[in-house]
Design a protein with these regions (language model features):
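Predominantly a Rossmann-like dinucleotide-binding segment in NAD(P)-dependent oxidoreductases
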Residues: 139-141, 149-257, 311, 395
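Short active-site oxyanion
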Residues: 49-53, 88-90, 201
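Glycine-rich phosphate/pyrophosphate-binding beta-alpha loops
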Residues: 208, 278-287, 346-350
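N-terminal Rossmann-like dinucleotide-binding module
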Residues: 2-69
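Glycine- and charged-residue-rich phosphate/anionic-cofactor binding loop of Rossmann-like
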Residues: 48-51, 363-381
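C-terminal glycine/acidic-rich active-site capping loop/insertion
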Residues: 2-9, 216, 234-260, 264, ...
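Beta-strand-loop-alpha-helix segment that lines the small-molecule cofactor/substrate pocket
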Residues: 89, 95-150, 165
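Conserved SAM-binding strand-loop segment of SAM-dependent methyltransferases
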Residues: 72-77
Length: 403
């Protein structure tokens, strides 16, 4: 175990600490660290988040991550971290193959849990996690899955407008999530390209986000899907040494890609709305292009993650001469989360979604309520991903979502 650093357990007198232990320190570990480090400094929280311990298998690398991101101590075994008395919450930022084991152990040990998306690699794993979370809730524990795009103020505002009936009955939902970091066939075979670690490819990495976002905005789960998936490059250079999932050094050998590179599917909501989804890591020139549009009887909303401080809104009840999409700049104190940030017109970024995620989780713990999204929500997304894979394997046959 690394030597503890000096860290206050309260930025304000009288607030009890929420001592966080995090497993994983790469891309998502850095993002979650930012959230825990900042939430209590920006928002008036009922508990004070304390970065107690960070865990990873490489002692030197995890020590460097602790120094860089403000963690007080380190562990190289997540089991030892869970057993510590100075950990109240376990934050899981590892590849999907370890989510279930860590989360189940943490819940059994009486800890609160935050788990990165997708919740697990299989429906069976996700179901066991959701059941354990429900049982833990009866003991006063909280378990949340990290779909951070719910925490963009603009998407939270969109959800508010849909719930208020501003769009009327929904007819269409269109969602795309496009990246291009796998276009080069010489990109190495990192863990994100291995089914045994990642569970799926673009479907779980990107598709999980847009399935959750669509269901969150519409307010109901998908009923069924018809899907296509494809793996464009089936063999890649093997990496040398450790990988982050997004980068590595290549060796002379090659290995098999065992996940999808792209997924396309159409879907139905129980209310009758039709939806289309596209997730790919082969959209040349697109770095992180998540876009969603909802069309209803009375209006439409559109959101673009690359312009994440804006919503486009069309009100079909306006006079024809004045009709059309207009921009809503989501930076006002009345918008979700923004009363604690900057004056109107000063935008936020990707990293702020993790601050908002930490804020919401702290409130759920303090209030003893189920967080959103819950492990049950994560299980629902996992069922959609499984139905997409089943449909694609059966030549795109319409596949109902299991409940």
């Amino acid at each position: 175990m690394g030597q503890p650093q000096e860290q206050s357990e309260g930025t304000e007198a009288g607030k009890p600490p929420l001592r966080v232990g995090m497993v994983g320190y790469a891309f998502m570990g850095a993002a979650h660290s930012q959230g825990w480090r900042t939430a209590g400094r920006v928002f008036d929280l009922p508990l004070n988040p304390v970065q107690a311990v960070i865990c990873g298998r490489d002692a030197a690398a995890v020590r460097a991550a602790a120094d860089r991101h403000g963690w007080a101590s380190t562990e190289t075994d997540w089991r030892a971290m869970i057993e510590r008395d100075d950990v109240d919450l376990v934050d899981i930022c590892t590849p999907g193959d370890s989510h279930a084991e860590i989360a189940l152990a943490a819940l059994a040990a009486g800890k609160h849990v935050l788990c990165e998306k997708p919740l697990a690699n299989t429906v069976e794993e996700a179901a066991s996690m959701a059941l354990a979370a429900e049982e833990a809730h009866a003991r006063g524990q909280v378990a949340m899955v990290g779909f951070n795009y719910r925490r963009v103020p603009a998407t939270a505002q969109a959800r508010r407008m849909v719930a208020e009936g501003r769009l009327g009955r929904l007819r269409h939902v269109r969602v795309t999530y496009l990246q291009d970091w796998l276009v080069d066939p010489q990109f190495p075979l990192t863990w994100r390209l291995r089914r045994e670690q990642a569970g799926s490819g673009s479907l779980g990495d990107l598709g999980a986000h847009i399935v959750d976002l669509a269901q969150y905005l519409v307010g109901e789960p998908l009923a069924g899907v018809s899907a296509l998936t494809e793996t464009f490059v089936r063999e890649r250079p093997l990496p040398t040494g450790a990988t982050s999932g997004l980068s590595a050094v290549t060796s002379a050998g090659t290995g098999q890609v065992t996940v999808d590179d792209a997924a396309l599917f159409t879907a139905r909501f129980p209310s009758g709305a039709l939806a289309s989804f596209e997730a790919t890591r082969y959209a040349t020139g697109r770095k992180n292009a998540l876009r969603i549009e909802l069309n209803g009887e009375r209006g439409s909303l559109a959101f673009d993650l690359e312009r994440l401080n804006e919503l486009s809104f069309h009100d079909a009840t306006e006079p024809g001469a004045e009709a059309g999409f207009r921009r809503i700049l989501v930076t006002e104190p009345d918008h979700p989360y923004l009363d604690a940030w900057w004056p109107p017109g000063h935008g936020l970024g990707y990293e702020h979604t993790f601050v908002h995620q930490a804020r919401d989780l702290v409130h759920a713990i303090a209030e003893g309520r189920r967080p959103e999204p819950s492990f049950a929500d994560g299980l629902q997304v996992q069922r959609v991903l499984a139905a997409v894979e089943e449909s694609a394997e059966k030549n795109s046959v319409y596949t109902p979502i299991a409940v």
